[in-house]
UniProtKB/Swiss-Prot annotation:
Superkingdom of the organism of origin: Bacteria
Catalysis performed (reactions): L-histidinol phosphate + 2-oxoglutarate = 3-(imidazol-4-yl)-2-oxopropyl phosphate + L-glutamate
SUPFAM superfamilies according to UniProt: PLP-dependent transferases
UniProt gene name: hisC
Name of the protein described by the UniProt record: Histidinol-phosphate aminotransferase
One Pfam family per UniProt: Aminotran_1_2
Organism phylogeny: Bacteria, Pseudomonadati, Campylobacterota, Epsilonproteobacteria, Campylobacterales
Length: 365
């Protein structure tokens, strides 16, 4: 059987290992496993949201309101934008897929950082687009502009991951806005701001204001409920852009693309600001501990504006350390698939991080 030729060079996205795998393979009880691989919220889900999901569970047989009116109203009020400027996705990565299907094709190219979220390339290759990456692993806007100017006739989509996953660095907001002014209005610029809450809390100069994006005709801001809001398992993301962009992307959206329970969870999550603040405060405090640990252990790391930190290694094998940690019930994210001798650690609660430090010390040479 012949398949779409664009699939030939594609590899599956490597997700963080689940707790169930560790239980099966190593016989460790689930309660003793610490998962710090997928940048989930270490406090879980807001208790208010859990109760809302329970209350709505009896309606699981019903399709959701496909207009997502209540959620869009809540997002619009929070960010100061209109409901027609918002699209809802099954995770923000679904909206990434919409963007590429809407703008990219085999005659066009997509521009991204040297090391960044893997799904940009996967979705781009699905539509047969060419990939351009910067020489630097981290975001360097001078390099972005250099490549853009050299291939203006090809590039149809540009991705900026702010802050960047899996490295953690983040550009200053002012330089991002200046960059956007240099890009032709027929090129769609996707600002993937899944970790924006963490960046903004740490340094206001790094936080993108989604309402500011509406000043640009060709830019879309992507946000998610998976990180700061603790709804990774609910799969809810959103995009904010000019109505002209949103209306085109909506043509690609299947009806009922998030569930009845996911919709209820997202609406309630926006109300619990105390839970989000608790999450951000813990992240900032515990991030400082990881940075101090890395300095003391002479581990290379990139200052992070996310809810994770990436440790890079020279002589030791990051994959070997990750595997050893896995056998002890601690799941980290080996970045071998990104061609890095590094692993990424989600910032956990204090007691979780204590165990990470203890086990890491046993593996460092």
């Amino acid at each position: 059987m012949k398949f779409n030729e664009n699939l030939a060079g594609l590899v599956n996205y490597e997700a963080g290992k689940p707790i169930e795998l560790v239980v099966r393979e190593f016989g460790i009880e689930a309660k003793d496993v610490i998962k710090l691989a997928s940048n989930e919220n270490p406090f879980g889900t807001s208790p208010h949201v859990v109760e809302a999901i329970k209350s709505a569970a009896s309606n699981a047989f019903l399709y959701p309101d496909d207009s997502y009116f209540e959620l869009k109203e809540a997002l619009g009020a929070k960010f100061g934008v209109g409901t027609k400027n918002i699209i809802i996705g099954s995770g923000s990565d679904q909206i990434i897929e919409f963007c590429l299907h809407a703008k990219a094709n085999p005659q066009s190219a997509v521009l991204m950082a040297g090391v960044t979220f893997a799904m940009y390339e996967i979705y781009a290759k699905q539509v047969g687009a060419k990939i351009y990456r910067t020489r630097s692993q981290e975001h360097d806007l001078a390099e972005f502009l250099e490549i853009y100017e050299a291939h203006k006739d090809e590039i149809s989509v540009i991705f900026l991951c702010l802050p960047n996953n899996p490295l953690g660095e983040c550009l200053d907001t002012k330089e991002v806005y200046e960059f956007l002014k240099r890009i032709d209005e027929d090129v769609l610029v996707v600002l993937d701001c899944a970790y924006n809450e963490f960046a903004k809390f740490k340094d206001a100069r790094k936080g993108i204001e989604s309402s500011e994006i509406l000043k640009f005709k060709n830019v879309i801001y992507l946000g998610t409920f998976s990180k700061a809001y603790g709804l990774g398992g609910m799969r809810v993301g959103y995009g904010i852009a000019k109505e002209s962009i949103i209306s085109e992307l909506c043509k690609l959206r299947a009806p009922f693309n998030i569930t009845t329970l996911s919709l209820k969870a997202a609406i309630e999550a926006l109300k619990d600001e105390e839970f989000v603040t608790k999450t951000l405060e813990n992240n900032l405090k515990q991030m400082a501990r990881y940075e101090a640990f890395a300095r003391e252990a002479d581990i290379e790391f990139i200052p992070s504006y996310t809810n994770f930190i990436t440790f890079k290694f020279d002589k030791q094998s990051a994959s070997e350390i990750s595997q050893n940690m896995l056998k002890k019930g601690i799941i980290l994210r080996d970045l071998k698939s990104y061609k890095l001798n590094a692993f990424r650690i989600t910032i956990g609660q204090s007691w979780q991080n204590d165990r990470v430090f203890e086990e890491l010390k046993q593996n460092l040479k």
